[in-house]
Swiss-Prot record:
<dbReference type="Pfam" id="PF02362">
    <property type="entry name" value="B3"/>
</dbReference>
<dbReference type="GO" id="GO:0005634">
    <property type="term" value="C:nucleus"/>
</dbReference>
<dbReference type="InterPro" id="IPR015300">
    <property type="entry name" value="DNA-bd_pseudobarrel_sf"/>
</dbReference>
<feature type="DNA-binding region" description="TF-B3">
    <location>
        <begin position="178"/>
        <end position="287"/>
    </location>
</feature>
<dbReference type="InterPro" id="IPR003340">
    <property type="entry name" value="B3_DNA-bd"/>
</dbReference>
<keyword id="KW-0539">Nucleus</keyword>
<dbReference type="InterPro" id="IPR044800">
    <property type="entry name" value="LEC2-like"/>
</dbReference>
<feature type="region of interest" description="Disordered">
    <location>
        <begin position="1"/>
        <end position="37"/>
    </location>
</feature>
<dbReference type="GO" id="GO:0003677">
    <property type="term" value="F:DNA binding"/>
</dbReference>
<keyword id="KW-0238">DNA-binding</keyword>
<feature type="compositionally biased region" description="Acidic residues">
    <location>
        <begin position="27"/>
        <end position="37"/>
    </location>
</feature>
<dbReference type="GO" id="GO:0003700">
    <property type="term" value="F:DNA-binding transcription factor activity"/>
</dbReference>
<dbReference type="InterPro" id="IPR016177">
    <property type="entry name" value="DNA-bd_dom_sf"/>
</dbReference>
<dbReference type="InterPro" id="IPR001471">
    <property type="entry name" value="AP2/ERF_dom"/>
</dbReference>
<dbReference type="InterPro" id="IPR036955">
    <property type="entry name" value="AP2/ERF_dom_sf"/>
</dbReference>
<keyword id="KW-0804">Transcription</keyword>
<dbReference type="Pfam" id="PF00847">
    <property type="entry name" value="AP2"/>
</dbReference>
Amino acid sequence: MEQEAAMVVFSCNSGSGGSSSTTDSKQEEEEEEELAAMEEDELIHVVQAAELRLPSSTTATRPSSRYKGVVPQPNGRWGAQIYERHARVWLGTFPDEEAAARAYDVAALRFRGRDAVTNRAPAAEGASAGELAFLAAHSKAEVVDMLRKHTYDDELQQGLRRGSRAQPTPRWAREPLFEKAVTPSDVGKLNRLVVPKQQAERHFPFPLRRHSSDAAGKGVLLNFEDGDGKVWRFRYSYWNSSQSYVLTKGWSRFVREKGLRPGDTVAFSRSAAAWGTEKHLLIDCKKMERNNLATVDDDARVVVKLFGVDIAGDKTR
């Protein structure tokens, strides 16, 4: 919730100028990534300062939602939240009440079991045994993360195909597409991965026309399964300014969790037709081998100490 409140202030502050929709979209992405990278205490400080700057017109004038756990947002969207031991757990922001209510119901089933009070009375009964097993196989934090990233339905479907516990797509069922060694800018503060133009236009399922409204706007969202079976969602866009295809929103979190560094390789592939009924994209990381020579030298090095000083060390100048 704190991130959503902070985003409201960012929107209010940036909305006073006459910048173009493309600039606003890029700024919005950068703000989202900046908020996602903040520590909890830093984020709370931002929100408290933001609340003092909010104009009176941003106070909720819309009626509260008719659904449990759903709250209206000043930007016209709907938020979902659930309470766990008197602490609020934010489940994300959604385009309509029904989607937010669905997120609450999913969280309620995971947090409180089949006896949970949900927005749809038959929610627990309507949930398949496979979905309940899928929820039981994932921690509360994992389910909340899926809901916030809007990947729950995709991960559920993949989980149902493979069984309740998420299992990665096996090697034999992967069709390699292309690889890229990430650059310092790919894993830096720009929060984006530049996808090689030829590979993007050849392999990705939603090619963006360079002057289309989608490319000039927010692009499209693509889901990728990693080597652990986890689904990642990235925004895929075409930037006219640099004439490049990029993965933006969601990329910085991937970099942080995978510990990507310059020189590491990101490998893209696609599930084979024989694996499941629906093809999907996959992403993997290959870490560059570092310090191997130093390790060998250290292991082979003879240490002779005199009064605590290594007298057999390398004396080359």
